[in-house]
Amino acid sequence: MAPSPTKRRERSEDKPRERGKEKAPAKEGAEKERGRDKIRKRRSNSTGSSSSRSSSSSSSSSGSSSGSSSGSSSSSGSSRSGSSSSSRSSSSSGSSGSPSPSRRRHDNRRRSRSKSKSQKRTDEKERKRRSPSPKPTKLYLGRLTRNVTKDHIQEIFATYGKIKMIDMPSDRLHPNVSKGYAYVEYESPEDAQKALKHMDGGQIDGQEITATAILAQRIRPAPRRLSPPRRMPPPPPMWRRTPPRMRRRSRSPRRRSPVRRRSRSRSPGRRRHRSRSSSNSSR
């Protein structure tokens, strides 16, 4: 006999009920275990941070549904990465915004050095503009022969201008012979330039000479030497010291009584004289 369709329906309805009854105690046991886990975690993490609380909530939600746990983990990872990136960006911005004191000092030194160099250059340029370099009025003549004298140089170089001074050092051993060079100083720099153009490489006494311009040295006053302070002579040693002035004064000499001379009679002297003369005559 085939079962009736009504019985089949009843059986099919009874099966899901039984399955629901079986699932209900399993769900209750799982919920109890979850509650116990939550209590334990709360006790252990009573002094924990907000991060531990969020992790406990995420773990409880992950037990209920795997999809929600994966979403929370991804969101927490993204939040961590975002916080780390924000902290890095803030640190980099802080470091870039406020440089270290050593860098500041280095930058200040560079700026001061560059300023000092630029100031020096400008000062030098201003000095050059204010005081132009003086033109030379003195010439150095080299490679002169020993036959050339002061008078020869005077005759030759006086044609180019008025000569102020001629210096021709002579040899020590031979005072009438020059050392082979001389100095000629003109009153105006134009005359000196003219003589330099014509006589540099010219010939005197059959020999080619050299002429070069020289700036005349300014005679500077010699610096005054401060006389050293006079030092008192050191005191003589104790054994050489003279007595004080009071002792130097010689006391008035004591009056001594005149020595009494013994009065002698002249007779004994005469006798002696006579005796001596008599003795001499007898001899």
UniProtKB/Swiss-Prot annotation:
For bias kind Basic residues, which ranges apply?
A: 102-119, 242-276
Q: Name one GO cellular component term.
A: ASAP complex
Instruction: Give the principal location in a single coarse category.
Output: nucleus
| Entry annotated with the keyword Cytoplasm | yes
Q: Where is the composition biased (Low complexity)?
A: 45-101
Which Pfam family, an example, fits this chain?
A: RRM_1
User: Taxonomically, which superkingdom?
Assistant: Eukaryota
Respond yes or no to whether keyword Membrane is given for this record: no
Q: What does this protein do?
A: Component of a splicing-dependent multiprotein exon junction complex (EJC) deposited at splice junction on mRNAs. The EJC is a dynamic structure consisting of a few core proteins and several more peripheral nuclear and cytoplasmic associated factors that join the complex only transiently either during EJC assembly or during subsequent mRNA metabolism. Putative component of the spliceosome which enhances the formation of the ATP-dependent A complex of the spliceosome. May participate in mRNA 3'-end cleavage. Also mediates increase of mRNA abundance and translational efficiency.
Q: What name does UniProt use for this protein?
A: RNA-binding protein with serine-rich domain 1
Source species of the chain: Danio rerio
Taxonomy of origin reads: Eukaryota, Metazoa, Chordata, Craniata, Vertebrata
